[in-house]
Amino acid sequence: MLVLAAATAAALFLAPWLVILPAALLAFTLWFFRDPPRTVPRGAGLIVSPADGRVTDIAEIEETELVNRTVRRIGIFLSVFDVHVNRTPADCRVVYTAEFEGTYHDARSPAASTHNTARTWGFECPDGVILVVRQITGAIARRIVPWARPDQQLARGERFGMIRFGSRTEICLPLGAEVTVRVGDQVKGGSTIIARLAPAGETDADLRPPSDLR
């Protein structure tokens, strides 16, 4: 221990950058992988953000990988300064997960949504509606870490995975859902309410599970 302390002191005296640079990198890594606790809102039909970041787009698209319907997609950009842990948008069961190998465009580019390496999740809510969530890599973020398993039951706001460094997360909602955020809003995964589903019996059937998922 004394030898290590002496070596550290000598390094600080002779070449401070030898210690400062690794220490700064270590501090950034620890800060980047932070996972702060979140207060998860309660209430029927509430959908919380699956990621920290900024809402970059809200649009109607054709979701062809899982539900084959027109959906309302909310895109969230995660900078390197955001928490990168992903959280479930609602109480749900994992009914689908698959990874697509692609390119590594900047996560803010429109091409990132369809061309970048990504992992798609299908989360079935208690009323049978499926929420589609995509973890999308970026120019820097090149690794998706899935934590949840197929058929696993998850509570709203529970951690299901992580994307390392700047990236994008998307959530696809039924057209009948009431979106409560706007482009430019900052959101927090697991705590910011981004939408409300219609009451049971009134929700449109555009995101009901396909027969092979039932």
Question: Where do the language-model regions lie?
Answer:
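Contiguous, well-folded functional domains in the mature portion of proteins
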Residues: M1-R214
